From Swiss-Prot:
GO biological process, any: positive regulation of osteoclast differentiation
Protein name, UniProt field: Interleukin-23 subunit alpha
Organism, scientific name: Homo sapiens
Keyword Secreted carried by entry: yes
Assembly mode: Heterodimer with IL12B; disulfide-linked. The heterodimer is known as interleukin IL-23. Interacts with IL23R; this interaction enables recruitment of IL12RB1.
Protein family membership: Belongs to the IL-6 superfamily.
InterPro entries given in the database record: 4_helix_cytokine-like_core, IL-23_alpha
Main subcellular location of this protein, as a coarse class: secreted
Residues forming coiled coils: none
Amino acid sequence: MLGSRAVMLLLLLPWTAQGRAVPGGSSPAWTQCQQLSQKLCTLAWSAHPLVGHMDLREEGDEETTNDVPHIQCGDGCDPQGLRDNSQFCLQRIHQGLIFYEKLLGSDIFTGEPSLLPDSPVGQLHASLLGLSQLLQPEGHHWETQQIPSLSPSQPWQRLLLRFKILRSLQAFVAVAARVFAHGAATLSP
């Protein structure tokens, strides 16, 4: 007869084969999330355009700056919040990942040879999608904030918009990576 531990592992086997890290109501595979979020940080920095000084006054395109998700103090991503209930924080991170994945798939980032699937931006897009799927509980769809419908950008706007989006993404994935590093170090079984 199989021991209870072996039975539990057998029950989890189909679940892990589907690539899910967060069963409904439980904690994620913190180490997997940590590794993927560290990769996202590296990709976000390598995807950043190599340009000189840019004047980034926030007076311009409100469409891509006002609705950008941020991880804030009240999101439960602090050590105590993660210990008590990590789901709110993970949902917030998931919302941000989906938001940036949509932006990277928009016309702001398409049509450029440097943005092909093997490019840093293409890899960044795929990694964002991978981590968001890793966080999505099976059979449970978190409410995602309304992704703003972007009007088509003009070619002359795209360089500045890319710069702003990638800069904001760098900050977001840096905080997410810290959350997952803490979770992997202190909350993993």
